[in-house]
Amino acid sequence: MKRKLQHLWICFAMFLFLAVPFNVKAETETTPVSISVKYGQTEARTILDMINEARTDSNYAWYWNKDDTTKTYCENLQPLQYDYDLERAAMQRAAEIAVIYDHRRPDDRDTFTVYGENSVTSYTRMGENIAAGYETAASVNYGWREDDEPYGGQGHRRNMLS
C-alpha cells in the first residue's frame, strides 16, 4: 500500500510539473560576438547589374496588383547607382545576418537604423532583400524575381522595381 501511495504521489508530482505553465523569457542582456566575414562585393555589383537590366526590360518590369489578376508595369525606371555608403551599410547588415538571419538587427533594432550609422541619407524608399543558401549571384537574383508569385509573394520584386 505504501509503495502504491509513493507511485501515486510521483505521478501526481509529474502531472503537476507538466501541467503548470512556465514563462520563458529571452535573455535581456546581449552577448558580444566576434566574427570574421568575407564580403562578396563582386557578387553584389553583379546583382546590381542584373537588377538594372530587369528594371529596363518591359518583360520583367512589372508586378501583380493586390487583386492578383492585373499587372502594374514600371516604365521609364532609371538604373540604380552604386553608392559606397550604402555598400558599407550592406556589409554591416551582411555581418549581422551571419549572426541572426532576420530583417531586424541582432540587438532587435529596426533594420534601417544601419543607414544613419553609415551616412546613408539620400533615399526616397528603403527595402532590404536578404538571401541565404544560394550558390551564385544569378540564383539569388532569380529567387528575388518571384516571377510566379502572387502580389503577396512579390515583395523582393517590388523592392527591386521601386
What is the meaning of each model-derived region?
Residues 1-10:
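Bacterial N-terminal signal peptides that target proteins for export
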Residues 3, 84, 132-134:
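Short, flexible loop/turn elements at secondary-structure junctions
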Residues 10-19:
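Bacterial N-terminal signal peptides
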Residues 19-28:
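Sec-dependent signal peptide cleavage junction
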Residues 27-120, 157:
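Short, well-ordered surface patches within globular domains
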Residues 96, 110-162:
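A well-ordered secondary-structure block
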